[in-house]
Design a protein with these regions (language model features):
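Sec-dependent N-terminal signal peptides
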Residues: 3-11
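Electrostatic cytochrome c docking/interface patches
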Residues: 14-36
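Glycine-rich, flexible loop/turn motifs
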Residues: 17, 21, 54, 112, ...
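Gly/Gly-Pro-rich "capping" loops immediately C-terminal to redox-active cysteine motifs
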Residues: 24-27, 32, 49-84
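The canonical Cys-X-X-Cys-His
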Residues: 33, 37-48, 99, 103
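Generic structural signal for alpha-helix termini and adjacent loop/cap motifs
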Residues: 47, 81-82, 106-109
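Flexible coil segments in periplasmic/lumen-exposed cytochrome c-class electron-transfer proteins
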Residues: 88-135
């Protein structure tokens, strides 16, 4: 596992921080995250991620403005440490990363060729950006 992380480090160090617009997850990872989200998250956050009485939305403007400029690492840490509400810290890092990949796909961030990592330091290099940067 350490070797995989070391092999990916140059990709993240090329030009500093990446954003959620840089294809930071794969379609396959998002597909794995979909049933995990349905099982672990949808009862509170709704099937369409629109939120519920006690749970905020995980899609759209409110979600994106709350996380804009923060890192995917911070988001994954929040998920890991506080969710599911009835059993925090019970899901693996891989499960949380797959759910986050699904969340990114529903928020219409593009998929890429490399899976969203589970390593916290690598995830801190990925910024959540609500607006697509101009090139």
């Amino acid at each position: 596992m350490k070797w995989a992380v070391l092999l990916l480090l140059p990709m993240f160090a090329e030009d500093g921080a990446r954003t959620t617009w840089d294809g930071v997850y794969t379609d396959e990872q998002a597909a794995r995250g979909r049933p995990l989200y349905a099982r672990e998250c949808a009862s509170c956050h709704a099937d369409a991620m629109t939120g519920g009485e006690m749970a905020p939305p995980l899609v759209g403007g409110e979600f994106l403005s709350n996380w804009n400029g923060l890192s995917a690492g911070e988001l994954l840490d929040r998920m890991r440490n506080t969710m599911p509400l009835n059993k925090p810290k019970s899901l693996s890092r891989q499960t949380n990363a797959d759910i986050l990949a699904y969340m990114l796909s529903v928020n219409r961030f593009p998929a890429g060729k490399t899976e969203l990592p589970t390593d916290g330091e690598m995830l801190k290099q990925i910024k959540v950006e609500a607006m697509k940067p101009e090139k």
